């Protein structure tokens, strides 16, 4: 399949739904969100796109703010996961790294590149793992 980005950091999926690409069977449109910044208003935009038949894939999300840092908003994150599961939308969390920021899945003190355990994960990493 082909993933197609949408305007405004892959948030304007409702705009893409107004004029989708024609003649292709293997296209999905990307949606990005950070639960600390993007709430129900962005889910409403996604719902409008879904209502028009636009296939969506979340190719980047986190539960920090949009900077990739700040506090984790697990309440809003859970609302997003419920929305994605209800609408059968697949998703990828950002970011599989050990950078010292809220959106890193691996603790900054961890240097190994494989065979991580729950002890190696950040709070965000453990939260995301619990969703699978």
Question: Language-model segments: what does each one mean?
Answer:
Residues 1-90, 94-98, 103-131:
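Extracellular glycoside hydrolase catalytic/binding regions
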């Amino acid at each position: 399949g082909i993933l197609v980005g949408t305007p405004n950091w892959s948030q304007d999926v409702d705009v893409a739904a107004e004029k989708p690409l024609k003649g292709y069977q293997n296209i999905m449109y990307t949606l990005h969100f950070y639960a600390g910044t993007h709430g129900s208003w962005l889910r409403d935009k996604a719902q409008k796109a879904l209502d028009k038949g636009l296939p969506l894939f979340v190719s980047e999300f986190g539960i920090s703010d949009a900077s990739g840092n700040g506090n984790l908003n697990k309440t809003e994150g859970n609302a997003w996961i419920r929305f994605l599961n209800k609408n059968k939308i697949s998703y990828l969390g950002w970011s599989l790294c050990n950078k010292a920021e809220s959106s890193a899945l691996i603790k900054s003190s961890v240097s190994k590149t494989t065979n991580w355990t729950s002890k190696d994960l950040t709070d965000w990493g453990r939260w995301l793992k619990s969703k699978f």
